[in-house]
């Protein structure tokens, strides 16, 4: 902790903000200290920590002071952490929260998640070393320490050791890649054989497809799901998480909405999305918050709330006038319809069918007969035969 210096938190000239995350606690080695709830900012030059309650409490450390970083997984009652190993403090260091420390590393505890994306972006900055190409003001230059990530190796022995480490890392990556590829090929082969079997039976008409084969085929399709679902561990628990989730929802719901006439109830969306996400289940609250951002992000979907409180997702191209005109035409053909009868005719849920009929009634195209037999809708003759 003696590597940190007090700062205003303002970015210097040529310094750019990369990512930030709330709810981060700092450990001095394994020891808990008073800095337990703050916002951690990563710039091209520094790690900056600002207290969430007292914004005047702000400190920073140069990325050039970092030797290397590593991840520490979450445990029972413990948050995931990033361990940051540091060079010794320079002799001309400016004042900070600690003048000395026995530890050569700190831990960043992410109580509100987001550590995966933060670790990735920090690793990128340590690799690219942009602080070397974009010098900033003298106030930061004076605190520049030894260059991180470099192994002090002299002569042929050092070169050989470095080459050996690089070779081992390459071998490990290749082995893992081929192992994953083998598993993928086995699964793909099973899917191809099953698909051919079903297609041949349909083509040759040599018998019905058994129920077991249908279930197996559907399970393969569902297991494909979303390849990389948006999670709190990746994007944290704030607005960024809901924005990324909204973009992913727009991608996976486009085709199902087109197949269902351009509209789906939020309950249907919830079931469909969680089925595709597999183990990474989504809470109803997160789904609603993400759907509220669809229109603001100019995505092809939008959230709509009917007067009854029913929430639906619909395509931006879905027109209310066409929906009402279609409902009026169907009811006029049959003379009168209940919500259940209308739902069977148009192939949608009873909930959405009722909302469509109520909307047509609100616009004056239909009228109702609410009796002991239930709610029945009729064409409004005052409008159609005027």
UniProtKB/Swiss-Prot annotation:
Protein species of origin: Homo sapiens
GO molecular function: phosphatidylinositol-3-phosphate binding; ubiquitin binding
Location of this chain's protein in the cell: Cytoplasm; Endosome; Late endosome; Membrane
Role noted for this protein: Component of the ESCRT-II complex (endosomal sorting complex required for transport II), which is required for multivesicular body (MVB) formation and sorting of endosomal cargo proteins into MVBs. The MVB pathway mediates delivery of transmembrane proteins into the lumen of the lysosome for degradation. The ESCRT-II complex is probably involved in the recruitment of the ESCRT-III complex. Its ability to bind ubiquitin probably plays a role in endosomal sorting of ubiquitinated cargo proteins by ESCRT complexes.
Coiled coil (UniProt feature): 160-185
Entries under CDD domains matching the protein: PH-GRAM-like_Eap45
A cellular-component GO term for this protein: late endosome membrane
Keyword annotations from UniProtKB, A to Z: Coiled coil, Cytoplasm, Endosome, Lipid-binding, Membrane, Nucleus, Protein transport, Transcription, Transcription regulation, Transport
Protein name per the record: Vacuolar protein-sorting-associated protein 36
Database matches in Gene3D superfamilies: 6.10.140.260, Pleckstrin-homology domain (PH domain)/Phosphotyrosine-binding domain (PTB) (2.30.29.30), Winged helix-like DNA-binding domain superfamily/Winged helix DNA-binding domain (1.10.10.10)
Oligomer and partners: Component of a complex at least composed of ELL, SNF8/EAP30, VPS25/EAP20 and VPS36/EAP45. Component of the endosomal sorting complex required for transport II (ESCRT-II), composed of SNF8, VPS36 and two copies of VPS25. Interacts with VPS25, SNF8, TSG101 and CHMP6. Interacts (via GLUE domain) with ubiquitin. Interacts with RILPL1 (via the C-terminal domain); which recruits ESCRT-II to the endosome membranes. Interacts with ECPAS.
Domain GLUE N-terminal: 1-88
Record remark: domains: The GLUE domain (GRAM-like ubiquitin-binding in EAP45) mediates binding to ubiquitin and phosphoinosides.
Domain GLUE C-terminal: 105-138
Effect after changing residue 10 to D: No effect on interaction with ubiquitin
């Amino acid at each position: 902790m003696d590597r940190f210096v007090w700062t205003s938190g303002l970015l210097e000239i040529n310094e750019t903000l990369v990512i930030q995350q709330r709810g981060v606690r700092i450990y001095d080695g394994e020891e808990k200290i008073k800095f337990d709830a703050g916002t951690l900012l990563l710039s091209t030059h520094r790690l900056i920590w600002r207290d969430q309650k007292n914004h005047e409490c702000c400190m920073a450390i140069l990325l050039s002071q970092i030797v290397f970083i590593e991840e520490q997984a979450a445990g029972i009652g413990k948050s995931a952490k990033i361990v940051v190993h540091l060079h010794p403090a320079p002799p001309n260091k400016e004042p900070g929260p600690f003048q000395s420390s026995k530890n050569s590393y700190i831990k960043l505890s992410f109580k509100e998640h987001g550590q995966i994306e933060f670790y990735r972006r920090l690793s990128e900055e340590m690799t690219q070393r942009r602080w070397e190409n974009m010098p900033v003001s003298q106030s930061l230059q004076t605190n520049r320490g030894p260059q991180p990530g470099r192994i002090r190796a002299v002569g042929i022995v050092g070169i050989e050791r470095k080459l050996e480490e690089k070779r081992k890392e390459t071998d490990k990556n290749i082995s893992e890649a081929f192992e994953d590829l083998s598993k993928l090929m086995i699964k793909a082969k099973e899917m191809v054989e099953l698909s051919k079997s079903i297609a041949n039976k349909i083509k040759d008409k040599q018998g019905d497809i058994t129920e077991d084969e249908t279930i197996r085929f559907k399970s393969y399709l569902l297991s494909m799901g979303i390849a990389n679902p948006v999670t709190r561990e990746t994007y944290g628990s704030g607005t960024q998480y809901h924005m990324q989730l909204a973009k992913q929802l727009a991608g996976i719901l486009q085709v199902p909405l087109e197949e269902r006439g351009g509209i789906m109830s939020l309950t249907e969306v919830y079931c469909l999305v969680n089925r595709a996400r597999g183990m990474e289940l989504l809470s109803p609250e997160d789904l609603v918050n993400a759907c509220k951002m669809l229109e603001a992000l100019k995505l092809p979907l939008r959230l709509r709330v009917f007067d009854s409180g029913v929430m639906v997702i619909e395509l931006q191209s879905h027109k209310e006038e066409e929906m009402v005109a279609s409902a009026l035409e169907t009811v006029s053909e049959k003379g009168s319809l209940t919500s259940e009868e209308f739902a069977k005719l148009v192939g949608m849920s009873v909930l959405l069918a009722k909302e469509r009929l109520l909307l047509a009634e609100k616009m004056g195209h239909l009228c109702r007969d609410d009796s002991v037999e239930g709610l029945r809708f009729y064409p409004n003759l005052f409008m159609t035969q005027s």
